[in-house]
């Protein structure tokens, strides 16, 4: 870990709130989801609490929301993203939780997920080469996929998930 390249920041978007679903929509953030596999229904719809999953909500919907606060822990292969919101999920790393959806995870060596901050031309960004305290970034996973919005049948939420490049979102990373 390179502590000189680690830093705290907020992650937001211009017209969309980004945070845990419990902050965006209230707790519990329940979703009743029907799963399909290869065009076939694979069971009864099940209701789950998605409060600890990451999502986005248009700013014009509902009340305002604070931005997602993170600690970006630098490693030679990318950044671990650690949630720094006060509350139940403070100090929990972000990782894949359900389908390809990201959320707060209990800490553990086998669960950490690495992300690369990239600019619009897909060039890696680190604290060292940021020229301003607010930088537009996309997040690339260690699988060379991007973080973008995902809508799941039966759920009222838009999740942050591992997606293809065409579905990636651009965030505003504000160094604190």
Task: Locate predicted features.
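Lectin-like carbohydrate-binding module/patch detector with strong preference for beta-trefoil
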Residues: 1-176
